[in-house]
Regions:
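Conserved ABC ATPase "signature" region
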Residues: 100, 115-133
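Conserved ABC transporter NBD signature motif
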Residues: 61-78
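Catalytic Walker B motif of ABC-type/P-loop ATPase nucleotide-binding domains
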Residues: 162-166
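ABC ATPase nucleotide-binding domains
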Residues: 228-229, 235-261
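Helix-to-loop junction immediately C-terminal to a conserved catalytic motif
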Residues: 53
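Conserved ABC ATPase signature
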Residues: 137-141, 145
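Conserved structural motif at the start of ABC-family nucleotide-binding domains
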Residues: 7, 22-24
Length: 261
């Protein structure tokens, strides 16, 4: 594995029981890249991420993160933000306590926070504009505010790689804009970012690399090379209108193909 490669996936396959999710996936993501993964619901995108994190085992193949083989535990220096609706808080926890969870792998044998841990937590909360909620119960926050808390928790671990599964789903347009531009600023500082999203236009406008995924990789590369009607049709099994104006690419809503034709 090249020292400039953050993620390398070799001949990766995954099954749930007899249900084959995908087979023979190969992928390299270089350090410092901001890559978007797009595709329809149920296409295997989240499963691919879980394999990168070591949360589930592949049927076949290997995943390397920053030169190390991923086995049965998440690699260090990875921040992960799952889909908002997948996170449940049925026990009382403040914003500070939730974000402090991101520091646990830095605490050594004794799981007690020190002044440096608290400083880092306050710093990321300030950077994300939610320091005023530090002592609030997380369930009292709006969806957008909660999403910022989970982003803060991931950043508190001081990651080299940040993986986000639809971080702007279910939040208002301003929060979507703020989160995306915050991620862009992190990427400019050298953090490698992988973003699962349904927002093709945001990917086209801001990200240097996109991976179209549906039971495997359909295409990958620069958005201007990948976002073409034939590739998107294979990805979504739908006709997608692509409008180009200079460097700007706009995707209209996809219309499912008539399978009766």
């Amino acid at each position: 594995m090249h020292e400039q490669t953050m993620i390398e996936i070799k001949n990766l396959s995954c099954k749930y029981g007899n249900n084959e999710i995908f087979k023979g996936v190969n992928l390299k993501i270089e350090k410092g890249i901001f890559a978007g993964i797009v595709g329809p619901n149920g296409s295997g995108k989240t499963t691919l991420i879980k394999l990168m994190l070591g949360v589930i085992k592949p049927t076949n193949g290997k995943v390397y993160v920053n030169g190390g083989l991923v086995k049965n535990r998440p690699p260090f220096k990875i921040g992960y933000i799952p889909q908002l609706e997948a996170i449940e808080w049925d026990f009382p926890v403040t914003v500070e306590q939730a974000v402090m969870m991101g520091r646990y792998n830095k605490m050594g044998i004794l799981p007690w926070s020190n002044k440096e841990d608290k400083r880092i937590v306050r710093d990321v909360l300030e950077r994300l504009g939610i320091i005023q909620y530090i002592n609030h119960h997380i369930k009292t926050l709006s969806g957008g505010e909660q999403q910022r808390v989970f982003l803060a928790r991931a950043l508190a671990s001081e990651p080299e790689l940040l993986i986000l599964d639809e971080p702007t789903s279910g939040v208002d347009l301003k929060t979507q804009h703020d989160i995306l531009h915050f991620l862009l600023s992190l990427n400019r500082k050298g953090i490698t970012i992988i973003l699962i999203t349904h927002d093709l236009n945001a990917v086209a406008a801001h990200l240097p690399r996109v991976i179209c995924f549906n039971k495997g990789i359909i295409a990958e590369g620069r958005p201007e090379d990948v976002f073409k009607p034939d590739i998107l049709k294979k990805t979504y099994n739908a006709d997608v209108t692509v409008v180009r104006s200079g460097s700007l690419i706009l995707m209209a809503n996809a219309k499912p193909l008539n399978t009766d034709d």
